[in-house]
């Protein structure tokens, strides 16, 4: 069995990761770290997992007991952790934040889009998981880049739901503000643009990075429930 640990286990991303790992026949979750929820049951936070696990959040980090470590932390926290902790050399790491998605001589993380880097991922100890928008956009554009067809400007208009903003509430995350509404955020400057450009140029070196414009919007459609 592959023993896995998770740091930052209380967010939406972690909840989905926990569900996937619980249902994986070859994985055993050794610990789920969350300093703000230490001692609480996983199902107290991720109620959709009720009946699936009796695991409890911990503030401990027994890194020498696991084979793979997942980071579900806020952007910037993974890098801080790696720089301040003695991580076992043979420990495999999968980072779900944006800290290591861009290639650099300063780290050895591989961009974790299997449709693009499957072989390299299999041989790597450190994997940077792609962003959500970046994944769906690349799956649409990479086949064109592979055949060198991205020779004109690329316009992307993408819409996401409320969970994309994370579990922490904010002024624009309330139901009364989002309900049946559509709003633009980070126009033409979304943090996923650099990784999209990086992947497109990997397959089509002639692609001009300034040729892609990315407009993101958030929405929460109204749902009508019939009353009996």
Task: List each language-model region with its residue ranges.
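Contiguous C-terminal substrate-recognition/catalytic subdomains in enzyme active sites
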Residues: 173-175, 180-228
């Amino acid at each position: 069995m592959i023993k896995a640990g998770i740091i930052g286990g209380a967010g939406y991303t972690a909840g989905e990761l926990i569900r996937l790992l619980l249902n994986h026949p070859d994985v055993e979750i050794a610990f789920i770290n969350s300093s703000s929820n230490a001692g609480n049951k996983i199902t107290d936070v991720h109620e959709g997992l009720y009946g699936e696990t009796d695991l409890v959040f911990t503030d401990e980090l027994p890194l020498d007991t696991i084979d793979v470590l997942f980071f579900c932390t806020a952007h910037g926290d993974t890098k801080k952790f790696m720089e301040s902790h003695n991580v076992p050399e043979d420990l495999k790491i999968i980072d779900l934040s944006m800290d290591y998605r861009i290639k650099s001589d300063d780290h050895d993380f591989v961009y974790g889009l299997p449709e693009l880097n499957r072989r390299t991922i299999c041989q790597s100890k450190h994997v940077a998981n792609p962003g959500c928008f970046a994944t769906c956009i690349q799956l649409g554009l990479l086949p064109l880049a592979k055949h060198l067809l991205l020779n004109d400007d690329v316009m992307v208009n993408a819409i996401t739901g409320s969970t994309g903003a994370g579990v922490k509430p904010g002024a624009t995350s309330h139901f009364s503000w989002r309900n049946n509404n559509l709003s633009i955020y980070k126009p033409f400057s979304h943090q996923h643009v650099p990784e999209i450009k990086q992947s497109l140029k990997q397959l089509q070196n002639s692609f001009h990075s300034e040729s892609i414009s990315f407009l993101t919007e958030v929405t929460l459609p109204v749902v009508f429930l019939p009353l009996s």
